[in-house]
Amino acid sequence: MTILFLTSVNDEKRHCFYDFPGARMLFDDPKDLDAETLASVDAIFGNPSRDLVEKCANLRWIQLNSAGANKYSWLPEHIVLTNASGAYGPAISEHMLGCTLGIMKNLFRYHDLQKRKDWRNLGSVRMLETSVVLSVGAGDIGGHYLHKCKSLGAYTIGIRRKAHEKAPYEDESLAFSQVDDVLPRADIVALSLPETRETIGFFDYRRLSLMKKDAILLNVGRGSAVVTDDLVRIVNEGHLAGVHLDVTDPEPLPEDHPLWNTERIYVTPHIAGRFNAEVTLDRVLDIFSKNLAHALKNEPFENVVDRSIGY
């Protein structure tokens, strides 16, 4: 089996893959490989372009280094697509928790005051132990976030596509169809949704209006889940205490986009995940290693993407 690595790894991590019998590893830039070599590739580790996939005539498996797989709806059915779901939850949920506390404790506002040398008490702050935290999307990322919030005393509610037995860190577990009923109860609403037909534009002006006036909104899933113009409008109208977006629509944000300068909206450039935490890369490599072992033994893969739902 010939595997083309598109995921950048150092020499130490590369050596971990030399011990797989029957596996030939290609760490070259695809641009440096001739047509015959590309045609011999059986598997790709990384997120290939459509053009590259079409050059790999023998391709049978792609192991993405991301959890999201929505960009691969065009992939031929005979190619197995596996994702890296399970690798990103710890790092992204820490980012979410940091941003949650930054808003609740006025830390971002105090930083603005510091730049102006303004020594002033901004008054009351909020506590997680008296908050209701709702995660719309309660898989790897949302689940880790709820777990962290629960450990700090929050009342936690997880929303999944279908009704599900509640996890130990959940006080309630609800179905996606119940989101409108529970939004008015939540002090913090965290979105970690994949991009599907059902989730695009899901949080529009009507749903944002269902949230408490002083609620906090976080989005770390896909920017398309929130109608950006509606979000800017409702925040400018005085609704929502704070918003953190690690994902936006569009991405990257144009320099003149209103999200940059809207009060109480805080943006990070889609960096909560990626490989900024080395442990995340290690987890992705572990998922790939397990699936490579399965492939070499003709065993079923883990983390197979369900094409019917997009993740």
Language model features: what each stretch is:
Residues 163-258:
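Rossmann-like adenosine-cofactor binding region
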Residues 151-169:
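NAD(P)-binding Rossmann-fold cofactor-contacting core
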